[in-house]
Amino acid sequence: MSMLHPPRFALQAREGNHLRLASATGAAIELFVLEEDIVRVLVLPDGELRGPATWSIAPGTDDTPFDGRDRRDLGGFALPPFELQVDADTLRLETGKIRLSVALAGGHCAWAIRQGGQWRAVLSDRATQAYNFGFWDAQVYHYVRREPGEMYFGLGERAGELDRARQRYEMRNIDAMGYSARTTDPLYKHIPFYLTWQPEAAAGFGLFYDTLADCSFDMGRELDNYHGPYRYFAAQHGDLDYYFIASPDTPLDAVRRFTWLTGRPAWMPRWGLGYSGSTMTYTDAPNAQERMGEFIERCREHDILCDSFHLSSGYTSIGPKRYVFNWNRDKFPDARGFVDGYLERGIRLCANIKPCLLRDHPAFAEADKAGLLVRDAHGEPAWVQFWDEVGAYLDFTNPDTVAWWKAHVKHALLDYGIAATWNDNNEFEVWTPDAFAQGFGKPYPVREAKVLQTQLMMRASRDAQREHAPSARPFLVSRSGGVGMQRYVQTWSGDNTTSWETLRYNIRMGLGLALSGVSNIGHDIGGFAGPAPSPELLVRWVACGVFMPRFSIHSWNDDATVNEPWMYPQATGQIAALIKLRYRLIPYLYELLWQSTQAYEPVLRPTFADFPADRRCYAACDDMMLGASLLVAPVVEAGQTRREVYLPAGARWVSYWSGEAFEGGQAVTLPAPWDEPVMLVREGGVIALNVAEQHFDRRGDRRGFLVVPVRGAGVAAGGCIEDDGETEAWRQGEQGRWRVQAVSDAHTVTLSVTQEGRMPARADTVELFLPAGEARQVLAPQARVLEQAVAGGWRRFTLQLPR
């Protein structure tokens, strides 16, 4: 098709909320009015779908069909009524929140969202060649106008600044070991969603491109005088299939709705929030079982709380190579006894598994003969480089492969008592052009959907765990992944390198993931690759990591050292104290993960997400919100003993450590000892705590709450979810909730604490902590005050609760 004669469209058909525009050239555009705030556009240069089904779309549900969801399936959407007008030049549709105008000459789209009762224009396709109707090649393009002052957030796991403006990114998942958290691209994950935000207008929208193909985003790095300012999306294969999500009031609107659109985050066991030990060194050692036993002894010696250990792939070695599902009996002469020893101490094992079989793997011939591998055009295995050997990937679009994988996960791991799978090295780096996958009976070139293999691998692992222990909540970890990975796994930012720069930019990387629907995240504390961290860097990294949902110290240091809590005797006490702080905060973190599962709330977020009207919150910084009530300001530079932090306007903030209150809208400088990370509670906030004394051999769980009453008249409210922490009984309603309120007026603060639902154990007492500077009379009419005390800037009330 020539650019001289772009297609002219006319409304061809309407079936409910699905409209099809067709042209004489054969090109078509399909529109789907899915929700008041979500409209989808599908551009088909040849009038037909090129790409496979979708595994991304699971609106408000736990999953998609294993073999994918039909791209025209409207199940799960509200399909609201909408207004439609068509004249000679334009098709216009309008919901309560979105107005879309499509120019019939060329199909260019212009979008507006309703804000404050008025329509605000927020996005327009580029006036020149916004789409590729066969003008250049077979790739997919979408060019849109770039407006002054726009900021762009999301795109999943990306290096550099949180604002993606003026940068270019590639989604081509690779094993980027030792990456720079400031500059390296691409990385491990494929999440083609981003949020556009206009700070001046405090309005924005999300765009999600539903593609499994390698793709790229240019956010204004490229300039071309013939087209004006623009940004664009490009994919090597498939269709231009995108979702527009209105976000008129806060950036969180689009984030929540994108997470809802792509599936409910998994509700994982509570123990997944504890400290998880990890290193490659132990399992690489000839006496691996002995080294693993020493880890438990050191935890006991130094009173390091621990709930799990990531078992690196050295347990599968034959010589220097790794062979998935193979136990090295020389390193682990008593594998069952080894696992039992960990379980007796309350530490679960999360075993590393990889989806590639080396050519000399003991099971390679079996898998090859059964047709379980990705193949080339000649029917031979599609050979790839995998670590220091050649191998072939398993094909998870073949049901026989899935069955084989699940059987091996159960037999080689779960039957031994292994609690979880660590799905690693699963970027599926298949570069052979003619490699193909079975595609559930519809073979396709692997390069068109590599990340699909990653998603199906983690799902197969999850299903194996469910089948093995139907009553237990599965816990899984995956390094690579794509849209919807939150339905299955916890993840981390891969094999980072040891440096202060990594500590700083991993924070921003994690926030980018959280703004892309993936909240159960963390980073390798101390750095995976490179030299050993200094004592100061290690402690600061731990002090930052205690606020991440995934909390693991991991390493493969160049100098053969091991990142461990006790690697520096002068810092061990501070690290142990920080880990105990982590366990004190677990009830709050558990509640935040519940809100992620139920309300699609990001656990971590930049301050501007909660304070979009405060322009100072948009400046690049190292601060973050943990939920809506806790502001965290990690130290990311050597030698700092104090930390300046900007407090968002519109609220007062109270130091966790001193109880001192500060007005918002200003920067303050606070003490930052190694073992006291800077954290402030928002006015009106309630932070759930475990106030029991904790030791390695003696755990406890007793609930307390930090409460910051509203100044003047108002209500501080919060609480936390309570269940058994491990089983699926919550699905049958076996769950309770603490609710805490502090109702304030000029003279009094009235406290209310209730336990609702099916609490796993009803408490007789609870501790509430109010700032020591709270001078108003404190009342608790529904409870009896057993004790009052002031310590550390907080006034503690021990309440006896009614039965």
Model-identified regions with their sequence ranges:
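Catalytic-domain carbohydrate-binding cleft regions of carbohydrate-active enzymes
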Residues: 4, 12, 117-675, 682
